[in-house]
Amino acid sequence: MVDALESLWPMIKTRSDPHTIVINLDNGPENSSRRTQFINRLVQFAKENNVDINQTYYPPYHSKYNPIERVWGVLEKHWKGELLTSVEKVLGLARTMKWNGKNPIVTKIQGVYKKGISLSQKAMRDLENMIIRVPGIEKWAVDIWGYEG
C-alpha cells in the first residue's frame, strides 16, 4: 500500500497539495496498525512529504461500507468470462472498466519483500511515540503527524 501511495503522491500533491491524507483500510493483516514495517513506512512517508496521515479501519465483517469492495464487484463483472492469462491482460481489463463513470488509475507495483522482518521492540516503541492511537478505538484509528505547516 505504501508503494502505491508513493507512486501516486506526485500527482496528488500537484492537484491539491494536501497537508492531511485520510486512508480508510480494511482489517487485512497486511495493513494492520500493529504491523511494524507498515507503520514504519507510513511514518517515514509522512515525515518525508510533510503530511499528516489519518488511518481509519473498517470494522470486521463490514465490507459493505468499503468502496473498494464495490469496485471489486464491478471489476469481476467486467472481466466475467475472460481468461486471465497474463498480468498484462488483467491490467488491461482493469484499466478499461468503469466505476461511477470513471476509469481507475491502474499501475503495476514491482517489489519483492523479505518475510519475517520486523522492528525491534525499542524501535516500535519509538514509532509508537510518533503516532496517536485514538482512545477507545486504538486498533481502528491511528494518526501519524508529519505536517509542519
Model-derived segments and spans:
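Active-site beta-loop-alpha junctions of metal-dependent nucleic acid enzymes
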Residues: 1-14
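Alpha-helical scaffold elements adjacent to nucleotide-binding pockets in ATP/GTP-utilizing enzyme cores
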Residues: 4, 37-42, 70-75
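C-terminal regulatory/effector modules of DNA-binding transcriptional regulators
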Residues: 13-17, 44-47
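C-terminal accessory extensions appended to soluble enzyme cores
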Residues: 15, 79-149
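Extended hydrophobic secondary-structure segments that form protein cores and membrane-embedded regions
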Residues: 20-27, 55-60, 93-94
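Acidic, metal-coordinating catalytic cores used for nucleic-acid/nucleotide bond scission
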Residues: 25-38, 59-65
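Two-metal-ion acidic nuclease core segments, chiefly of the RNase H-like superfamily
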Residues: 38-54
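RNase H-like two-metal-ion nuclease catalytic core shared by retroviral integrases
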Residues: 55-77
